[in-house]
From Swiss-Prot:
GO terms for cellular component: cytoplasm. Keywords: Cytoplasm, DNA-binding, Repressor, Transcription, Transcription regulation. Disulfide bonds: none annotated. Its main location: cytoplasm. It comes from Cronobacter sakazakii (strain ATCC BAA-894) (Enterobacter sakazakii). It comes from the Bacteria. It holds the Pfam family Trp_repressor. Residues 68-91 bind DNA. This protein is an aporepressor. When complexed with L-tryptophan it binds the operator region of the trp operon (5'-ACTAGT-'3') and prevents the initiation of transcription. The complex also regulates trp repressor biosynthesis by binding to its regulatory region. This is Trp operon repressor. The gene is trpR. It is found in: Cytoplasm.
Length: 109
């Protein structure tokens, strides 16, 4: 292994640990009803809007009534963002997909 790849592996591990720390903190904030102030503190208005758009992308992909190009026009998102959402949804565990369908689609009926 080269020094560069060792550094990259260590950096990836640190990044993963930071992500898991964030997830744990977010869970604790929900348990203490502090999730909205925490997310407002950590995310810019643009980042919050982007997350909302990503949820809409997943929702519409699950619904299956619009093409990716139609989603691009409807949501103002880039085609690459929509394609990543589609690919991620295809790779998602079945139980997550089922839960998302229930939360995003059936909750509206």
């Amino acid at each position: 292994m080269t020094q560069h790849s060792t550094y990259s592996a260590a950096q990836a591990e640190q990044s993963n640990q930071e992500w898991l720390r964030f997830v744990a903190l977010l869970k604790q904030s929900f348990d203490n009803d502090l999730h909205l102030p925490l997310l407002t503190l950590l995310l810019t208005p643009d980042e919050r809007a982007a997350l909302g758009t990503r949820v809409r992308i997943i929702e519409e992909l699950l619904r299956g009534e619009m093409s990716q190009r139609e989603l691009k026009s409807e949501l103002g998102a880039g085609i690459a963002t929509i394609t990543r959402g589609s690919n991620s949804l295809k790779a998602a565990p079945p139980e997550l997909r089922q839960w998302l369908e229930q939360e995003l689609l059936q909750a509206q009926r």
